[in-house]
Amino acid sequence: LDHLAAEFVANGWSMKQLIRSIVLSTTYQQGETAHAEYAERDPSNRLLWQMNRRRLDLESMRDSVLAVAGNLDLKQSGRSEKIENKSNANRRTIYGFIDRQNLPSLFRTFDFAGPDTTCGRRFTTTIPQQPLYLLNSPFIEAQAKRLVESVQALKGEERIRAMFRQTYQRDPKDWELDSAELFIDQFVPYAAAWDRLAQALLVSNEMMFID
């Protein structure tokens, strides 16, 4: 912090230069890639030689799913909106209605900070309700259907590739492509197979975690 403060003053209090210094630093660009030598010396990553893997918070998770499906409403400002249990609520989560006395269960499930108390840092929990929501939520199912609709013009392998590119910004690996094709061929009823594949992509660890 002292170094950044000195740089900030030396560069004429330029926020642009400060942000540039941060985002171009080696620390900011770290990934979760393992390094055998460093892992042996510092297995707990106390010295921060790699980025600690972390799960997306509720707002980032929900907005990412909406964005990938092509449904995210980017409108700014306006009244808050109840987003729990509404499959057609496409506004950014920051505009979700918060009842201080009765926090919606969706927010509690994904570790949203209590609005009626001071919270310096959110807790991160792993509980059964989280995957149950992702697998059974009408909201997630609606976004999966929308994702399939966006690649409806493509067929077979090309549709699978397009879904991976749209979701993960990459092509599927060979084994992923083979597994997806096998899943589509064997799923009953066939008409729902693509929706289920899309849902699996949307709720996978690659989507929910930052590496």
What annotation goes with each model-predicted range?
Residues V23, E176, L202:
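Active-site-flanking alpha-helical
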Residues R20, R161, K173-E181:
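Short, well-structured alpha-helical segments
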Residues L1-V9, D178-V188:
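Amphipathic alpha-helical segments that form the core helices of the histone-fold
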